[in-house]
């Protein structure tokens, strides 16, 4: 006989009277993540097979990286090792064959905790970009909360939809951006309203529990890519 139990609770405490405002990544008033639930599903196949069966192609996976920080330096069960995060991002770019200038949007891990500013700093250092040169940043967790083991799949689906439909979803509840983040990236790169944008390449990352990191580089598919 085997059994398991997980009792989730809302980790934020400042918005009990307005629960829809509790999930607020990148804000000065963030007080912890709000658990969410759901699933994301997609079909991965090579281009030749997809074309032969007439599949609707939403995006291409150019490359990516998975690593672990080993819970060293400042890494822990719940916080990533910054050195490993930066290495994961850099290696994903190399594996995908793109430069930091090619990234239009970062669909980030950002969880509405004290580590948000550290994550933004890691992106800035890994991409060697700051201020207005940082790609747009957003976090789906402001919409659906943190779906724990399912978070990466949900957020990857959102990235694919942003690419295929040409938009950047807003960061909800982001009324006052954390001052440490504004020292790294220009405020206009943290959209708080829906933006219609013709995106080409998105970097999606998850820096999850256990100090395990993943970053994937996605490209918008077009008919001109059939010979790729």
Residue ranges and their predicted role:
Residues 58, 82, 86-89, 100, ...:
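A general structural signal for well-ordered alpha-helical packing
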Residues 56-64, 101-108, 134-141, 170-179, ...:
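Beta-strand segments within the central parallel beta-sheet cores of soluble alpha/beta enzyme folds
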Residues 1-2, 100-117:
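Conserved beta-ketoacyl condensing-enzyme motif
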Residues 54, 97-98, 127-133:
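Short helix-capping segments at alpha-helix termini
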Residues 88-96, 122, 126, 155, ...:
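Stable alpha-helical structural segments in soluble proteins, enriched in small hydrophobic residues
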């Amino acid at each position: 006989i085997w059994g398991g139990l997980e009792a989730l609770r809302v980790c934020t405490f400042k918005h009990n009277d307005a629960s829809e405002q509790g999930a607020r990544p990148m804000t000065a008033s963030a007080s912890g993540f709000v658990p969410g639930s759901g699933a994301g599903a997609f079909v991965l196949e090579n281009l030749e097979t997809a074309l032969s069966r007439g599949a609707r192609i939403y995006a291409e996976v150019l490359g990516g990286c998975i690593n672990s920080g080993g819970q060293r330096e400042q890494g822990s069960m719940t916080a990533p090792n910054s050195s490993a995060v930066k290495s994961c991002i850099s290696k994903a770019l190399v594996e995908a064959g793109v430069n930091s200038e090619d990234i239009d949007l970062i669909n980030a891990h950002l969880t509405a905790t004290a580590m948000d500013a550290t994550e933004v700093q890691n992106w800035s250092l890994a991409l060697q970009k700051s201020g207005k040169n940082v790609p747009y940043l957003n976090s789906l967790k402001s919409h659906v909360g943190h779906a724990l083991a399912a978070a990466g799949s949900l957020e990857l689906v959102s990235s694919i939809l942003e690419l295929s439909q040409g938009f950047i979803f807003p960061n909800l509840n982001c009324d006052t951006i954390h001052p440490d983040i504004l020292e790294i990236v220009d405020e206009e790169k943290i959209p708080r309203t829906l933006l219609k944008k013709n995106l080409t390449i998105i970097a999606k990352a998850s820096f999850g529990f256990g100090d395990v990191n993943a970053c994937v580089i996605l490209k918008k598919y077009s008919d001109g890519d059939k010979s790729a």
